[in-house]
Amino acid sequence: LPEFAKAIPVCKVRGRDLVGLPLKAPLTSLPRIYSLPMLTISMKKGTGIVTSVPSDAPDDYIALMDLKRKPALREKYGVKDDWVLPIEIIPIITVPYKRDDSPEDQDPEMTDLAAQVACDEFKVSSQNDKPQLLLAKAKTYKLGFYEGTLKIGDCKGMSVQDAKAHVKM
């Protein structure tokens, strides 16, 4: 690689050192949010912070619910109650959702909390329910991308597919 393309480390940071970092996030009613752990993310490699979308991502939804419901989990990772308990899920995308066990002639119901609905449908009760979580994730991501409509932001009212193309321009 040319010299200008080489990364120069400034310092080393462990993933667990990022837990509790106060952040400002767009499109949230909270004045600050905090960096929280997810069991599906390795804290030993690739430390970093990513946006969580618990309305539409089953991994994110169930990680948030685990932290809200389980004081012992919060304690294990040093997560303070006021970092997690006040969080309300902000709906981002509306999708037509039909449970796999619904009668064929039943119309889908519109939801803006697809991750919660999918976790209920596939009986995901924690981040450890990996096979069910994969099913929930496959369904919500497909529905969101191909049939979802954005509820907020500059692309409000656009299909997710169109918004993705619009943002790339």
Report the location of each language-model feature.
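Protease-associated
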Residues: 1-49, 59-62
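Residue patterns forming the tRNA-binding/recognition surfaces of aminoacyl-tRNA synthetases
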Residues: 30, 46-169
